[in-house]
Amino acid sequence: MYFAEPVAKLIEHLAKLPGIGPKTAQKLALYLLEIPEEEARALAEAIITARKNTRYCSICFNLTDTDPCAICRNPGRNHRLLMVVEEAKDVAAMERTGSFNGIYHVLHGVLSPIKGIGPEDLKVRELLLRLSREPVEEIIIATNPTVEGEATAMYLASLLKPLNFKVTRIAHGLPVGSDIEYADELTIRKALEGRRVLE
């Protein structure tokens, strides 16, 4: 199907978004062209504002508009309990459950030798530095139940256990090969409750 160049360019950019294929990009582009101009401007402004005003927390590396983030600076959180997650979206998924009152550390990925991602490409060094300064007692490793997620969990456990931390792994109420982000609140809560000590 032929589209004018500006529309084709919009479709091309939308198709670069995760989970958006060419047909969905086309559908979204046509929808965006149909909405009132003020709605389109508001969407564009929201994207620009989010890009401009969002940064990574200097403590946990979660997305935030303040530094440190609201979770890290909250004295009501249990700062002795730290959950390590792959991505910022995993923090959002955990927070949705309302069942975790500790703090987080976002790795920004997982180990993947095939993709050339090693520990130096993740926030592992920052995690170790943080643990030397904070009163953390238990570390919950909440990487996704994928091959890379498991490898990352085992690597972290091998680093952290000699440092005398209690290191646990969330239970696998989560289906193997899936992402935490897509799990419902009950599944995440059960996985959190059933965490186990990593040997």
Curated annotation (Swiss-Prot):
Cited function: May play a role in DNA repair. It seems to be involved in an RecBC-independent recombinational process of DNA repair. It may act with RecF and RecO.
Family from the record: Belongs to the RecR family.
The entry's keywords: DNA damage, DNA recombination, DNA repair, Metal-binding, Zinc, Zinc-finger
InterPro entries referenced in this protein's UniProt entry, alphabetically: DNA_Rcmb_RecR, Hlx-hairpin-Hlx_DNA-bd_motif, Rcmb_RecR, Rcmb_RecR_Znf, TOPRIM_dom, TOPRIM_RecR
Domain Toprim: 80-175
Superkingdom, taxonomy of origin: Bacteria
Organism classification: Bacteria, Bacillati, Bacillota, Clostridia, Thermoanaerobacterales
Primary gene name: recR
Pfam families linked to this entry: RecR_C, RecR_HhH, RecR_ZnF, Toprim_4
Keyword DNA repair appears in the UniProt entry: yes
Protein name according to UniProt: Recombination protein RecR
Source species: Carboxydothermus hydrogenoformans (strain ATCC BAA-161 / DSM 6008 / Z-2901)
One function term, GO molecular function aspect: zinc ion binding
ZnF (C4-type) residues: 57-72
